[in-house]
Amino acid sequence: MPRFKIFIIFAKTDAGRKRSARRWRDCHKNKNIMQTKNHLSVLVHNQAKKYGDREALIYKDFGGKTWKSYSWNQFSQKVKTVSNALLNLGVKPQENIGVFSQNSVQYIFSDFGAWGVRAVTIPFYATSSEQQIQFMINDAKVRFLFVGEQEQYDKAHRTLAHCPTLERIIVFDNSVKIDPNDPNAIYFDEFMKLGENLPRQTEVESLYKQANLDDLANILYTSGTTGDSKGVMLSHLQYKAALEANHRAVHVTEKDRVMNFLPYAHIFEKGWTLLCISEGATLIVNTDPKEVQKSMRETHPTSMCAVPRFWEKVYTGVQEKIDNASTVQRKLFRHALAVGRKHNIEYLSRGKRPPLALHLEYEMYDKTLFSLVRKQLGLEKTNIFPTAGATVSAHVEEFVHSIGLKMVVGYGLTESLATVSCDRVGEQPYTIGSVGRPIYNIEIKISDEGEVCLKGDTITKGYYNRPDITAESFDEEGFFKTGDSGYIKDGELFLKDRIKDLFKTSNGKYIAPQMIEAKLLVDKFIDQIVIIADQRKFVSALIIPEYKLLEEYAREHGIQFAGREDLCGNALIHKMIMERIETLQQQLAHYEQIKRFTLLPNPFTMESGELTNTLKMRRKVINEHYKKEIEAMYAE
């Protein structure tokens, strides 16, 4: 059956206002994806048959300094050992198993090993609080919990008394000090001995045959910006559909070396990692997120998925070096960036061939200046860099493309098993500011209220133990309501903001805070920012400065300070930051521009409840914590 697309556009005039709803769907169905009995339980073993002793995983031990590796055959053997050990512990099909750890190879073995016995894995963020893990363990009735390092073990151990179903804690890191009075905890190495020599492999293989695509693979609890915790159910059918769709849209190959640094508890990294495994790529497992740039320089990945904040840091770092360079060097680099922008964005992104003279000039800069920048990042030989999770500033997106890195901007949710849409860099024209074209086999509808709604094989069937919220999350046509406002133009999806985050000023103007925040986060002096505007006369902001740079600026300009509070209250500092804000917000409408701001001495944190585990702002909590500072900005 041929593959084809259908756009259905509905429009009518209502009191002089044009209203439209757009739908996109790729109608082709792949029989292998829809009907096969193979699911994630056998993925690694199939790849081992294909790739054998080729390198599959590159990693460091917990606290280790040296990079090590596993071949595909070794990877497969470890997964089988986990499956056998789980059977010896008494794990049943579709039983829920928790994984509370930072990224590690043990984490990957545990995921695939659990799927091998048709169990369900529930990833917890390594930064989760005791209250959060207690809720998830009790909600999902978890008996067995894998944990990473000392922090995770200590939290799990203290939670035991409040979790009646929890029987066993399995500790990945051998350096963790297990409480001598804790009979429930064992090290991962001890656990693996339960599956040594694969004593129950016949039963494991029988479970492979019984597996079906309706089996749950994961339950991912999303705390969200409101604080409500919901377990998103993801099946093997969703994963198979997602792998097929992303295979068509995102071209990672067996030649790629892929850095994993976002948490495996994040659906973006989890989905991306499984795609890379399914394509035969080599994974580089980064355990400590703070070490990612060091890891990149040591291992030279060709691809990785990232959130916009990563590229914002790269952008501000390069801009700082440009600002500190000589006049001649500064002029040269800015000209090179202008050439890169013209070549890669004005021509290539629009599907046009650059003029020969421009191409030759770009090639010169690409092999000199831009290659030096990429080398500093450890990105000498590169493929693609999927980026999602928040709004990407146009400045940052243009910069990344200009220096010769293929940023693939996309959009997705946990409920859609990551990708809904993404750029097709090098294949189809893409627009800076869009989140790309819808992926294969997903239907997008823009509701009358402007909400992005989804239907397709990658969409969750609902929330674990929450039929009430599940029912509220789908419309009468069976479309999942994302909560994001957006529109489709020329086949590309554009997002505005979270519907619940859209502010309406007291003058009746609508403000999209994430868009404004993304514009300002490119400034090197701004580390965090929250826009305030709802039912207010004008837009204001709470800003956490990048204090290391701000302190350097103060010393260079003779500004006396004893601590951060002095910097926050200094008039010269305020004047400097306001001037930088005014430069960045020139293209915003007058009513969108920040009129006042307050500098805060301490960052927004997960521990304070101001950030989610994915580092998104909990605006309600921040508004409550800084009510006094906010009211002061609006005082006459």
Provide a role label for each language-model segment.
Residues 18, 240-257, 264-370, 381:
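Conserved AMP-binding/adenylation subdomain of ANL enzymes
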Residues 44, 88-89, 116-194, 576-582:
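Structural core segment of the AMP-binding/adenylate-forming
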Residues 52-55, 170-171, 192-221, 228, ...:
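Conserved pre-ATP/AMP-binding loop-to-beta segment of ANL
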Residues 57-112, 129-134, 187-196, 234-237:
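Conserved AMP-binding/adenylate-forming core of the ANL superfamily
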Residues 69-72, 217-243:
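Conserved AMP-binding A3 loop
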Residues 76-81, 213, 232-253, 261, ...:
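Conserved structural elements of the adenylate-forming
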Residues 84, 128-159, 242-259, 289-303, ...:
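Conserved ATP-dependent adenylate/AMP-binding module captured primarily in the ANL superfamily
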Residues 438-505, 522:
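Conserved ATP-binding/catalytic segment of the ANL
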